[in-house]
Amino acid sequence: MSIVIPLGVDTAETSYLEMAAGSEPESVEASPVVVEKSNSYPHQLYTSSSHHSHSYIGLPYADHNYGARPPPTPPASPPPSVLISKNEVGIFTTPNFDETSSATTISTSEDGSYGTDVTRCICGFTHDDGYMICCDKCSVWQHIDCMGIDRQHIPDTYLCERCQPRNLDKERAVLLQRRKRENMSDGDTSATESGDEVPVELYTAFQHTPTSITLTASRVSKVNDKRRKKSGEKEQHISKCKKAFREGSRKSSRVKGSAPEIDPSSDGSNFGWETKIKAWMDRYEEANNNQYSEGVQREAQRIALRLGNGNDKKEMNKSDLNTNNLLFKPPVESHIQKNKKILKSAKDLPPDALIIEYRGKFMLREQFEANGYFFKRPYPFVLFYSKFHGLEMCVDARTFGNEARFIRRSCTPNAEVRHEIQDGTIHLYIYSIHSIPKGTEITIAFDFDYGNCKYKVDCACLKENPECPVLKRSSESMENINSGYETRRKKGKKDKDISKEKDTQNQNITLDCEGTTNKMKSPETKQRKLSPLRLSVSNNQEPDFIDDIEEKTPISNEVEMESEEQIAERKRKMTREERKMEAILQAFARLEKREKRREQALERISTAKTEVKTECKDTQIVSDAEVIQEQAKEENASKPTPAKVNRTKQRKSFSRSRTHIGQQRRRHRTVSMCSDIQPSSPDIEVTSQQNDIENTVLTIEPETETALAEIITETEVPALNKCPTKYPKTKKHLVNEWLSEKNEKTGKPSDGLSERPLRITTDPEVLATQLNSLPGLTYSPHVYSTPKHYIRFTSPFLSEKRRRKEPTENISGSCKKRWLKQALEEENSAILHRFNSPCQERSRSPAVNGENKSPLLLNDSCSLPDLTTPLKKRRFYQLLDSVYSETSTPTPSPYATPTHTDITPMDPSFATPPRIKSDDETCRNGYKPIYSPVTPVTPGTPGNTMHFENISSPESSPEIKRRTYSQEGYDRSSTMLTLGPFRNSNLTELGLQEIKTIGYTSPRSRTEVNRQCPGEKEPVSDLQLGLDAVEPTALHKTLETPAHDRAEPNSQLDSTHSGRGTMYSSWVKSPDRTGVNFSVNSNLRDLTPSHQLEVGGGFRISESKCLMQDDTRGMFMETTVFCTSEDGLVSGFGRTVNDNLIDGNCTPQNPPQKKKVSLLEYRKRQREARKSGSKTENFPLISVSPHASGSLSNNGDGCASSNDNGEQVDHTASLPLPTPATVYNATSEETSNNCPVKDATASEKNEPEVQWTASTSVEQVRERSYQRALLLSDHRKDKDSGGESPCVSCSPSHVQSSPSSHSNHIPQLQAKGPVPSFSELMEDPDPENPEPTTTNECPSPDTSQNTCKSPPKMSKPGSPGSVIPAQAHGKIFTKPDPQWDSTVSASEAENGVHLKTELQQKQLSNNNQALSKNHPPQTHVRNSSEQLSQKLPSVPTKLHCPPSPHLENPPKSSTPHTPVQHGYLSPKPPSQQLGSPYRPHHSQSPQVGTPQREPQRNFYPAAQNLPANTQQATSGTLFTQTPSGQSSATYSQFNQQSLNSTAPPPPPPPPPSSSYYQNQQPSANFQNYNQLKGSLSQQTVFTSGPNQALPGTTSQQTVPGHHVTPGHFLPSQNPTIHHQTAAAVVPPPPPPPPAPGPHLVQQPNSHQQHSVAHVVGPVHAVTPGSHIHSQTAGHHLPPPPPPPGPAPHHHPPPHPSTGLQGLQAQHQHVVNSAPPPPPPPPPSSVLASGHHTTSAQALHHPPHQGPPLFPSSAHPTVPPYPSQATHHTTLGPGPQHQPSGTGPHCPLPVTGPHLQPQGPNSIPTPTASGFCPHPGSVALPHGVQGPQQASPVPGQIPIHRAQVPPTFQNNYHGSGWH
C-alpha cells in the first residue's frame, strides 16, 4: 500500500482539517508543496513528512500512522464536505487540492480495476469509481468514499469492514456511489466523481501534493452537490493563480480529473477510458461564479483602472449577462461523442449570440504554466485567453467550471471567446461568430499554439476537414511528445493549458496520462489528447508514482506506442505492485524531467530573478560542478514561476530534481523539519537563497534560491538583489576561485561538495535545521515559521538574516564559500587583499592567523579553504587523504563562517588580546570580503546575530554538510559537529555575543551574558539543538535567538532585545569583533576563532561558548568524521582534527597558541588572581577549557590551535578536561559569578588551559553561550546558578568540543606536548601520561589529571575543590567512590562543584582518553572517563547542591554528567572537554560527563557521534552519574566493554572506540534524550540511559532545574542522577519539565531544568547516596531503590532491574520504536548507557571503521550509523543533535546515512522538531521519538534503539550490552 501511504501524505489536505499540518490552512498550502515532494518519489513518503506538518516529524505523511494500524477513515467523508466548504470558501487554498484531488480521482479511476481483484463495498456497487482501496488482508477492493476514508488521509494499512469491523455509513455510501454511477453515465454530476476521485487519490498516494489536492477536491466534489461541476475546478483555477506552485503539486491529482477531461477532448478509444472520461467529463464542480486568482484580479484591476471602468464595451453586456448569469440558460447542451463531451447548440443561434459563459478558475497564464505543465499535456478544460488588453490569462475549468468547458477547439470555429467586465471582474463568454444551426457543435478557435503541442492535438473539425492543419500537425506532434518541457513553454494558450494541465496533472495527469492520455493516443486522438510522452513526463513528475501505481502502465513512452485501449487493458491487468513499480519508474523519469525543466527554469530564473542566482548557479557549477548546477537549475527553474507556484514547483522540482532518492528523502526530511519554519518563508527563503548563493551550497543554493526565488519575487527581491551584488563579488568570484583552487588542491572536496550539497539540500529538514541552527539563521523565525517546503529552500542560511545585516549577508551563507575562496586566494595571493597579516594564513583570524599558521589544518578543516595557506592546504590535503578531507575544504568555510560569526559576538572579549584586535581590523576589512559572516557581524547587531546564526547555519547547513562531506568528512564532521553546537550556539552565539560582551565585561558581562544568554542561549541552544528536531521550538528559539543573539550583547548590557544592536555593538565594539569573527569563524570552522578569541580570555571564552556550541554542532558533524577518522586514522584523524580543527583554529588560534603559551603563564597568574573572581580571565580559562574541548573539533581545534597544532591537539586532548575543570572552577567559584570556579580552574587547571583558553575563544564563546543557556536556565530556574552557569556553560561547551577534538587529537595529544601543557596547567605532570593512569586515564587522563589538578587548583581557589580533586582522582578509578565522593562532596557544595569540575575534567580526561580510543589506555581512559562521568556526576551531584545557585545550577544541569555538562557547565568543562564541545555545549550542556563520552564517541562518528556524543556524553554522564553502574553505563555508553564495571577496564580498545562511539551515541542519544528527555524530563531516556537521560537529563534538566532551584536540584541532582541511574523511568516527571516552555526552549538547559524541576522532588528524594547507589549500582538496577526521592524515576529504576533486559528490550523496542520499554528505563539507564555504548559501539565501529566513516561514517556507519544515526537521529541525531542544536542534528544529516538512518530519527529529528517546542518537545520528543519517546524511557530507548538499530541494536543489543 505504499501508494496508499503517499496518499496518506496526500491526506495532508485532509490532514489539513484533521492533522497537525492539515490543521493549519496555510499548512495545507504549503502542504501541497511538501506533498509534491512526497509525490516526487516514493521515498518522499518518509522524508516528506507530509506537509511540514509538525506532528509528523520524521514521517512522510502527517496523517499516516506509520507502523500503526491505519486509523479508521470514516472522517474522510465528512472532511470532504468540510473541504468542500473550504473549497467554496477558500478555493484558493484547499480547494485546489480538492480539485486536484478530484482530478486525481478520475485518474485513478482510469486505472479503474486494479487487476482482477474482487470488488466488494458496503454500497453494494462493484463499479470502479476511480477511488478504490484494497484491503491489505483480503485484497478486496472498496470505494474509498464509501469506506469513509479521507482521501487525504489514506491509511498506510487498510482493512475492509470485515477484516476490521467498524461502523460505516452505508446509506451515504450507496448515495455516493449511485451519484457517481450517474455521473459516470451521464457525466452530469460530479459530486460522486469527486468522491470517486478520492479513491483514485489512494493510488495517487505517492503524489503527496496531488493527493492532498485531490482530497480536498474530492471532498468538495464529494460533499458538495456541486460535485457535478467540481467547484474544485474553479478552486483549482484560483489556486493555480494563487498558488500555482501548489497547484502544480495538486495538479497531479487534478491531472486525474484532467485526464478524463482531456479524454473528452480527445477521443478515448478505450472503453475503460470512455467510462472514465465520462466520469471525468461529468466530474467537475458546476461553477455558478468564477474564481479568480489574485494575479488575474490584480492584473484585471490594473487594466481596468488604466482603461477606466466602462472602457470595455462588453463590460455592460457582461453586467447584463452576469445579472442574468444564473437565470440565463445557455442555448447549448452537452453531448457525449466518442468518449468525449462536446457542446452542441440546443437551438439555432444567430451570429454574435451569447452562447454560454466560460466559467472556471481564472488565473494568469504563467500561473497556470507555473503549475508544472511542462509536458504539454492537453488540458481539455482550460481556456486560454489573451484578448483582454494583452493580459495572458486562462480559465481552468477542469475541476471547477460549467458546460462551456466541453467546447472544443477547431480549425474552423463557429464561436469565439469574448471578455466582459462585470463588478470589476472579468468574465469570458462564448459568442457565436456566425449563425449556428441547432445540434451543431460549438467550437472555438485554438486558444493555444497547437503547433507547439507535443501531443496529438484534437480538432473539433475532426476528420471532416482533410486539410485540417491541426490534424496534420497533430500527427507529427505525437513524435515530439517527449519535448514536453519545451512545448510547455512554447505552446500557446492551449499549450499552456496543456502545460498547466501537465503540471497540475503532472500528478493527476500522470495517472491520467497513463490511462487517459494513452487512450487518447489512439490514432483518433483528438486535439486534446495527451501524448503518451507528455503523460509520461507528467507521470514522471508528481503523479508519476500514483499514475504508475494506478495505471501501472510501463512509462508513457511505452504507453505512447500502445493504443489507449491497450493501455487501459494493460493497466487493468497490471497488479498493484506493477503499477507501483511503474509509478516509481515514472517518478524517476519525472525527476529527470523535472531536473531538465529546472535547468530551463533556472536559465529563466537566473535572468528573471537576479544575476546573483546565476552567479550562484555558476558558483555552484564551479564548486559543485554539474550536480549543483543541475540542482540550481532545477531549483531556479522553479523560481521563474510565480512565487507560489514556484514553491510548489520548487518543491516538486527539488524532489524531482534530486535524482537520488536518498537525496530526495533528505530533502523531504529537511522539508518536513523545516516545514514548521515556512510561515515566514519569503524572507527566509530569500535569505536562504542569498546564503546559498554565497555559500555555494550548491544544492541548498538551488533549493534556497528556488524557494527564495519565489519569496524574493514576492518580497525579497530587493534584498536578494542587494545580496547578489555582493555575492557576485565575494561569493561567486571568491567561491569560484576558491572552488577552482579547491578542486585543484582538493579535488575531492569539490566533488564532495557537489555530492554533499545534494545531500544537504536533499534533506530539507536538515537544511532547515542546519540553517536554522546556524548562527546566522538562528534569528530567523521565518525558518521556523515558514512552511517546511519553503524552509527547504530557505533553510540553508536564510539569506534574510544576511539581508538584515546586509554587510554581513555575505558572511553568513557566503562566509563559507567566501572563506574557502578567500582561503584559496590567500593561498594564491595574500588571503584577500584585506587580509594583510592574518589574511595569508587564514583570513579568519587576523592576528591569530599571523601567529598560528599551524592551525591552518584546523583552518583547513574550517577555514582552510578560505584562508588556508598553501601549507594549510597541504595539510588539508593530507587530512583529506587520511580523513576524507573532501569535506575539509568545504567544512572550513562553513565552520569558519559560523565560527567567525560566533566569535564576532565575542570579538569584544577577544578584543582583549590585542592580537586579534589588530588583525581584527584588518581581518574585519579583509575578512569582510573573506567571509561575509565576519563583516556581517560588524555591519549590524541583527546582522551579527543573524550572522552568527547564518554562520552557524552554514556549518550546520547543508552547505556545510556538503562541504564536510565533500571536503573533510572528518574535519568537517568535527567541525560540523562542532558547528552543531555552534549552531546550537545560535543561542550560543547569542551567548557568544554575550560572551563577547562578557569579554568586555568579563565578570558581570559574563555572568549576565551567561545568565541572559542562557535564556536566550537556551532557546537558541535548544533551537539549535532541537532546531532540526523541533522546528517550532527552533523557531521560537530562533526567534528568541535573534533577539537573544542580539540580546547577548545586550545581555552584556543587560538588554536582551537590544541584543541585536548591542550585539552588533559588541561585535563591532572592538576591531576584535571582526578578528573574533574570524576567530569564531575559524573556530566554527575549527577552533581558530577560539584561538583568536583567545586573545581576550573573556572573549575567548565567549567565542568558546559560541564555538563550543556551534563547534559542537559543527563538530558533531565533523566529529563523526573525526570518529571515523580517528578510528581508522587516529593519528591522521587526530591530526586532521588537530590540524584541521586546530589549524582552522590555529590560524586564529596559533597566535593565541603562542599567546596561549604565554597566556598559560599569563592566565595561570591571572587565574591565581582571578580565583578572586575575575570572570574575564576565567572565561579565557574556560575558553581555554572549551578550547581544549574545542580541540575536539572546532573548539578543540580552537584549543589545539591555541597551542600548537600538535600541542593544540594535546591541549585539546589534555586541556579539555582541565578546561572543564577550569570552567567548573569558574562556575564553582563563581557560583554566582561564574568566575570562582573558573578562576579556580583557571588558576590551576587552566594554566595550560589558559593557553587553552586563549585558544579556546570559541570554546569560551561556546562555553559562555552554554553558560548563558545555563544561566538562562539558572535565571529561569536558579538565577544564582545562572551566573555561574554561563561560565560553566562556556567551559563545558569548550570541554565538549575539546573532548571531541580531544578524541581526535588525543592520539596525537597523548603523545604530544599539549599534555605537558596540560600538565603544566594541572599540577599533575601526568596529564599527558594519565592515559595509563586510571585516574588520569591516559593522555585523556592527562586531561583528567588536569581536570583533577585543575580542580585541585580550583581547590586552591576554593578549598573544597582541593579535596574533591583528590577525590576526583580517586573517583576516576573507583566509580562508586567518585559517586560516593560526590555524595560526600554533596555536603561540600563548593567542593562538590570543584570536585565535579575535577571529576568532569577527569572525565573529560577520561573522555579524552576515551577519545583517544585507539589507544588501549584510551579505552581505559574511556572507562576512566566513564568513571569520571560517573564520578563527575557524583561530584556534580555534590557540586550541584552546593553550587546550586550558580555553579551548582549549571553543574546540576549536568547533574551527574549531564549536570556537569549542562547545569554543570563548570564541571561540565571537563565534560565539555570530555564531551562533544558541540553537543555538550548545547545539547550536552546538561551532560557534562556525557560530553566526554560523546566527544569520544563523537570523534569517530563525529557527526552522529558528536550529536550523539553530546547526548551520549550527557547520556554517559547521566549514565555515569545516574546508574551506580553509571560508570558502567557511561562506560557502557562509552564502552560497552566496561559496561557494568565501574572500573575503567579498557575492554577491547576497538570496543572502546566502538564503545566510545556507542557511548557517544548513547550519549548523543542520551543527550538528545537528555534534551528531549530534559524536555521530557528525560523520562524516555533509558532508565539507565533514560534514567540518566531522565534523571540524567533530568539531571541535566535538573541542572536547569537546579538553575531554577539550585537547592532543589542539588538534591535533585543527585537523585536526578539517581533517577537517571535508577529511575530514568521517572519519565513521568521529566515530561513535566517539558512543560516549562522557557526551559524547554533552553532545551539543553531547559530540558535539564525541566527534568530537574520535574525530578526535583523525586530527585531530591533521591539522595546523593542513592544517586551514588544508582550510579554505583546503577548498572545494576538495584540502585533504583536509592533514589526513592525520585520515586517516579525510581520506579523506572526497578525497570532498571529489568534494566539491562529492559534496556535491551527497550533498545530493541527502540529499534521497533516501541516505547514499551519505558519500564526498563533504569536498565535503560544502565542499558541505555550500555546500550548506548553498544549503540555507540555499533555505531562507533562503523565510524571507527575509518575516518572515512564520517561521510562514510554516515554511510559506512549507516548500518551502524543508522543505528547510531538512528539512535542519534531518533535519539541522538534528532534529539541529541537537537539538544546540541539541531545543528549537530544537521551535521548528522551531514552524514547522509546518519541523517537518513535517522529516518525514524528524522522523526526524532522531529524530536528535534518536537524538540523545538520544548514543552511540546517533551511530547514531541516523545512524538518524535514517537512511541519511543512517548514513553519517556521507551521513547528514549526507542530512539536509541532506532538510532542504534542497524549496528547498535545488534551490536549493542547482541553484544554491547550483555
Curated annotation (Swiss-Prot):
<feature type="region of interest" description="Disordered">
    <location>
        <begin position="217"/>
        <end position="269"/>
    </location>
</feature>
<feature type="compositionally biased region" description="Basic and acidic residues">
    <location>
        <begin position="1273"/>
        <end position="1282"/>
    </location>
</feature>
<dbReference type="GO" id="GO:0002446">
    <property type="term" value="P:neutrophil mediated immunity"/>
</dbReference>
<feature type="binding site">
    <location>
        <position position="123"/>
    </location>
    <ligand>
        <name>Zn(2+) 1</name>
    </ligand>
</feature>
<keyword id="KW-0597">Phosphoprotein</keyword>
<dbReference type="GO" id="GO:0005654">
    <property type="term" value="C:nucleoplasm"/>
</dbReference>
<feature type="compositionally biased region" description="Low complexity">
    <location>
        <begin position="1285"/>
        <end position="1303"/>
    </location>
</feature>
<keyword id="KW-0991">Intellectual disability</keyword>
<keyword id="KW-0338">Growth arrest</keyword>
<feature type="zinc finger region" description="PHD-type">
    <location>
        <begin position="118"/>
        <end position="166"/>
    </location>
</feature>
<comment type="function">
    <text>Associates with chromatin regions downstream of transcriptional start sites of active genes and thus regulates gene transcription. Chromatin interaction is mediated via the binding to tri-methylated histone H3 at 'Lys-4' (H3K4me3). Key regulator of hematopoiesis involved in terminal myeloid differentiation and in the regulation of hematopoietic stem cell (HSCs) self-renewal by a mechanism that involves DNA methylation.</text>
</comment>
<feature type="compositionally biased region" description="Pro residues">
    <location>
        <begin position="1543"/>
        <end position="1553"/>
    </location>
</feature>
<feature type="compositionally biased region" description="Polar residues">
    <location>
        <begin position="1581"/>
        <end position="1599"/>
    </location>
</feature>
<dbReference type="GO" id="GO:0006355">
    <property type="term" value="P:regulation of DNA-templated transcription"/>
</dbReference>
<dbReference type="GO" id="GO:0016607">
    <property type="term" value="C:nuclear speck"/>
</dbReference>
<keyword id="KW-0539">Nucleus</keyword>
<feature type="short sequence motif" description="HCFC1-binding motif (HBM)">
    <location>
        <begin position="63"/>
        <end position="66"/>
    </location>
</feature>
<feature type="glycosylation site" description="O-linked (GlcNAc) threonine">
    <location>
        <position position="440"/>
    </location>
</feature>
<dbReference type="GO" id="GO:0003713">
    <property type="term" value="F:transcription coactivator activity"/>
</dbReference>
<feature type="compositionally biased region" description="Low complexity">
    <location>
        <begin position="887"/>
        <end position="901"/>
    </location>
</feature>
<feature type="compositionally biased region" description="Low complexity">
    <location>
        <begin position="933"/>
        <end position="957"/>
    </location>
</feature>
<protein>
    <recommendedName>
        <fullName>Inactive histone-lysine N-methyltransferase 2E</fullName>
    </recommendedName>
</protein>
<feature type="region of interest" description="Disordered">
    <location>
        <begin position="475"/>
        <end position="530"/>
    </location>
</feature>
<keyword id="KW-0805">Transcription regulation</keyword>
<dbReference type="GO" id="GO:0045893">
    <property type="term" value="P:positive regulation of DNA-templated transcription"/>
</dbReference>
<dbReference type="GO" id="GO:0000785">
    <property type="term" value="C:chromatin"/>
</dbReference>
<feature type="modified residue" description="Phosphoserine">
    <location>
        <position position="1273"/>
    </location>
</feature>
<dbReference type="InterPro" id="IPR019787">
    <property type="entry name" value="Znf_PHD-finger"/>
</dbReference>
<feature type="glycosylation site" description="O-linked (GlcNAc) serine">
    <location>
        <position position="435"/>
    </location>
</feature>
<feature type="binding site">
    <location>
        <position position="138"/>
    </location>
    <ligand>
        <name>Zn(2+) 2</name>
    </ligand>
</feature>
<keyword id="KW-0158">Chromosome</keyword>
<dbReference type="GO" id="GO:0032991">
    <property type="term" value="C:protein-containing complex"/>
</dbReference>
<feature type="region of interest" description="Disordered">
    <location>
        <begin position="630"/>
        <end position="687"/>
    </location>
</feature>
<feature type="compositionally biased region" description="Pro residues">
    <location>
        <begin position="1677"/>
        <end position="1687"/>
    </location>
</feature>
<dbReference type="GO" id="GO:0042119">
    <property type="term" value="P:neutrophil activation"/>
</dbReference>
<dbReference type="GO" id="GO:0016604">
    <property type="term" value="C:nuclear body"/>
</dbReference>
<keyword id="KW-0832">Ubl conjugation</keyword>
<feature type="region of interest" description="Disordered">
    <location>
        <begin position="1581"/>
        <end position="1835"/>
    </location>
</feature>
<keyword id="KW-0472">Membrane</keyword>
<keyword id="KW-0804">Transcription</keyword>
<comment type="subunit">
    <text>Component of a complex composed of KMT2E (isoform 3), OGT and USP7; the complex stabilizes KMT2E, preventing KMT2E ubiquitination and proteasomal-mediated degradation. Isoform 3 interacts (via N-terminus) with OGT (via TRP repeats). Isoform 3 interacts with deubiquitinating enzyme USP7 (via MATH domain). Isoform 3 interacts (via HBM motif) with HCFC1 (via Kelch domain). Isoform 3 interacts with E2F1; the interaction is probably indirect and is mediated via HCFC1.</text>
</comment>
<keyword id="KW-0963">Cytoplasm</keyword>
